[in-house]
């Protein structure tokens, strides 16, 4: 059977493709390339967030100017273009959970939730309703045939690798999605945009968190979850109170800058005691993490979870989008996924994504991933952290009893 460039049967003109057009250079080039090849292309733009400063901020995603840019590109290419209002859905599925997670002391990655619940769920369903044979996006990731299905692989341009944000893509979605930019470097994509005369050829790349004006995520969270801005104490890992803070929302595990205390010692956020509004700080070595436990894992590997090797399997993992994958061992037992890191990571926070690969090479296959529930550090560090928390609880209890007696 003849397959076209998207691995679909027949000639390009036999296939209808929906392109998710964000108004940026990448998705615009995808639409242009597919149109040039002869595919029946339909552009769809999701209006996700269009309020206040985010609307006109350079690098905002799916806001007013982006929608206009997508419309202009579609008009130039001669393809139909539709705008779907997904603001309410985006608020419920992405923004609210993001604020809730941060208020609980986690470090969430909203782009993953957006791909998982909006772009690759709702938009994909719309593409099917339009009779499309595939949904194409401008993400930098590769999709190839793998047995009876398709699989995801790291892209040619590792500097633009977006696999970290796509690990939650289900097998059904992977089979339907196409990523034409996976084999192109970003520089070439911009060249193609210029050759096509696209108005977005020199447009800035979008930022990761599109709904946070000027990067002040704390303002968004404090507005939605005021309790996250409750004041509390900054406490050294040795138990000494160093000062006060204006809300857990301003901190994340691993943070060094902007802690708000000066001791002459390089201090990092080691732990967030959300219940008592305490920020625990300490030296960098207190952040060394050796083991991770994951929740909400999307497993795309070939091994059956029913017969998962008792010794685990060798994988590579990413706990940050900008870091290359590092070797580790993945275990699965009684419904629990855990990862033994062969190289320790610093400052891994609950809520972060841990993405799994079949190796640390440039063309590694994505095996899925999950979100960190908690981590384990060296035994002596764990003991020290538990001791300081226990001592603080004891002090609180004594203080409370004294106040009760005095009254």
Swiss-Prot record:
Its EC number is 2.8.1.13. The gene is mnmA. Belongs to the MnmA/TRMU family. GO terms for biological process: tRNA wobble position uridine thiolation. Residues 160-162 are annotated as: Interaction with tRNA. The record marks 139, 352 as: Interaction with tRNA. This is tRNA-specific 2-thiouridylase MnmA. It is found in: Cytoplasm. It comes from Bartonella tribocorum (strain CIP 105476 / IBS 506). SUPFAM superfamilies: Adenine nucleotide alpha hydrolases-like. Disulfide bonds join 114-210. Signal peptide: none annotated. Keywords: ATP-binding, Cytoplasm, Disulfide bond, Nucleotide-binding, RNA-binding, Transferase, tRNA processing, tRNA-binding. InterPro entries: MnmA-like, MnmA-like_C, MnmA-like_central, MnmA-like_central_sf, Rossmann-like_a/b/a_fold. Transmembrane segments: none annotated. It comes from the Bacteria. It catalyses: S-sulfanyl-L-cysteinyl-[protein] + uridine(34) in tRNA + AH2 + ATP = 2-thiouridine(34) in tRNA + L-cysteinyl-[protein] + A + AMP + diphosphate + H(+). Pfam families: tRNA_Me_trans, tRNA_Me_trans_C, tRNA_Me_trans_M. GO terms for molecular function: ATP binding; tRNA binding; tRNA-uridine 2-sulfurtransferase activity.
């Amino acid at each position: 059977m003849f397959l076209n460039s998207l691995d679909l049967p027949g000639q390009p003109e036999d296939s209808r493709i929906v392109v998710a057009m964000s108004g940026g250079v990448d998705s615009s080039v995808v639409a242009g390339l597919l149109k040039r090849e002869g595919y029946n292309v339909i552009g769809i733009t999701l209006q996700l967030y269009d309020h206040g400063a985010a609307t006109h901020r350079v690098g905002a995603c799916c806001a007013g100017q982006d929608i206009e840019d997508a419309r202009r590109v579609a008009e130039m290419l001669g393809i139909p273009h539709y705008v779907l209002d997904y603001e309410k859905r985006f608020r419920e599925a992405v923004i609210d959970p993001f604020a809730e997670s941060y208020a609980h002391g986690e470090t969430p990655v909203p782009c993953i939730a957006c791909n998982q619940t909006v772009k690759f769920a709702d938009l994909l369903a719309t593409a099917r309703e339009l009779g499309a044979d595939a949904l194409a996006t401008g993400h930098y990731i590769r999709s190839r045939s793998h047995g009876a299905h398709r699989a995801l692989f790291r892209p040619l341009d590792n500097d633009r690798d977006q696999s970290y944000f796509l690990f939650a893509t289900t097998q059904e979605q992977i089979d339907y999605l196409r990523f034409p930019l996976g084999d192109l470097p970003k520089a070439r994509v911009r060249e193609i945009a210029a050759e096509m005369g696209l108005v977005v050829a020199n447009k800035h790349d979008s930022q990761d968190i599109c709904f946070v004006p000027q990067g002040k995520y704390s303002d968004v969270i404090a507005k939605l979850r005021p309790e996250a801005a409750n004041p509390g104490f900054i406490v050294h890992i040795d138990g000494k109170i160093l000062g006060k803070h204006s809300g857990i929302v301003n901190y994340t595990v691993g943070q060094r800058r902007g802690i708000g205390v000066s001791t002459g010692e390089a201090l990092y956020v080691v732990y967030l005691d959300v219940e008592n509004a305490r920020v625990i700080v300490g030296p960098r070595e207190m952040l060394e993490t050796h083991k991770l436990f994951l929740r909400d894992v999307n497993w795309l590997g070939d091994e059956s979870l029913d017969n998962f090797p008792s010794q685990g399997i060798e994988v590579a993992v990413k706990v940050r989008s900008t870091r290359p994958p590092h070797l580790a061992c993945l275990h699965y037992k009684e419904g629990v996924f855990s990862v033994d890191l062969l190289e320790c990571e610093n400052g891994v926070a609950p809520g972060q994504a841990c993405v799994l690969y079949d190796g640390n090479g440039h063309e590694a296959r994505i095996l899925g991933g999950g979100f960190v529930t908690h981590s384990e550090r060296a035994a002596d560090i764990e003991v020290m952290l538990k001791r300081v928390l226990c001592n603080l609880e004891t002090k609180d209890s004594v203080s409370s009893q004294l106040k009760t007696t005095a009254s």
